[in-house]
Amino acid sequence: MSLTNTKTGFSVKDILDLPDTNDEEGSVAEGPEEENEGPEPAKRAGPLGQGALDAVQSLPLKNPFYDSSDNPYTRWLASTEGLQYSLHGLAAGAPPQDSSSKSPEPSADESPDNDKETPGGGGDAGKKRKRRVLFSKAQTYELERRFRQQRYLSAPEREHLASLIRLTPTQVKIWFQNHRYKMKRARAEKGMEVTPLPSPRRVAVPVLVRDGKPCHALKAQDLAAATFQAGIPFSAYSAQSLQHMQYNAQYSSASTPQYPTAHPLVQAQQWTW
């Protein structure tokens, strides 16, 4: 019994530095009652806890387990609380970022609809997004080619075109409506209204042969009558141009010799005689 007492006394007095064994027994006896009462840190911190704390503080391990000067990541490790706050902030701001990434630039027409939408109206938003279909290059080319041929399509033609390019008739109808409006707005901006094409211009050709005879000397009256019959008004020609044409006709008749027998019409008349 004396050996056990000395062992317990050595461990208690020298290591825990307790003043009396009676106090130890009282503290041990009171321990279960305190545990039954509830967690009270003020009552638990008796002379036993203080002695253990003093013993730990007297140990030579007062420095940290690693030297902060040798660790290159101390600037991030020193601000762990700031990182936690930033992570909470990112987690809180993540849902609106996801929602904005789905619709980065809502149009002006869709903004009031989005304001009116409620959390339960997610199906309507999905339907609206499905209606906005991006046409492929082949589909757009075929639609534009058909639009150049025919600006308005009937119901059977619309269905046939939709089946060819794998679209619905409603999508084809809406595309044609939008394209017509776009073309009309472009013409209005450029100031180009739809006008009928002008009739082809008629050019007056001088009469060289009349009634089987060459007309070398033309008078102004004959030329005016010829141009009037051709469809060009006489006012289109000035008097100076008429004189110039008459002079050229006279010069050509004077320079070229007259050979009546060489004319094919004259030969035909001679044979008929």
UniProtKB/Swiss-Prot annotation:
Ranges of Acidic residues composition bias in the record: 20-38
Coiled coil: none
Gene Ontology biological process terms from the UniProt entry: astrocyte differentiation; brain development; cell differentiation; digestive tract development; negative regulation of neuron differentiation; neuroendocrine cell differentiation; neuron fate specification; oligodendrocyte development
Location of the protein in the cell: Nucleus
Region (Disordered): 1-56, 90-131
Keywords for this protein: Activator, Developmental protein, DNA-binding, Homeobox, Nucleus, Transcription, Transcription regulation
GO molecular function: cis-regulatory region sequence-specific DNA binding; DNA-binding transcription activator activity, RNA polymerase II-specific; DNA-binding transcription factor activity, RNA polymerase II-specific; RNA polymerase II cis-regulatory region sequence-specific DNA binding
PROSITE patterns xref list: HOMEOBOX_1, HOMEOBOX_2
DNA-binding region(s) from the entry: 128-187
InterPro entries: HD (IPR001356), HD_metazoa (IPR020479), Homeobox_CS (IPR017970), Homeobox_NK-like (IPR050394), Homeodomain-like_sf (IPR009057)
Source species, domain of life: Eukaryota
GO cellular component, one term: chromatin
Subunit structure: Interacts with OLIG2.
Domain notes: The homeodomain is essential for interaction with OLIG2.
Family statement drawn from the similarity comment of this UniProt entry: Belongs to the NK-2 homeobox family.
Function, in words: Transcriptional activator involved in the development of insulin-producting beta cells in the endocrine pancreas. May also be involved in specifying diencephalic neuromeric boundaries, and in controlling the expression of genes that play a role in axonal guidance. Binds to elements within the NEUROD1 promoter.
The protein's name in its UniProt record: Homeobox protein Nkx-2.2
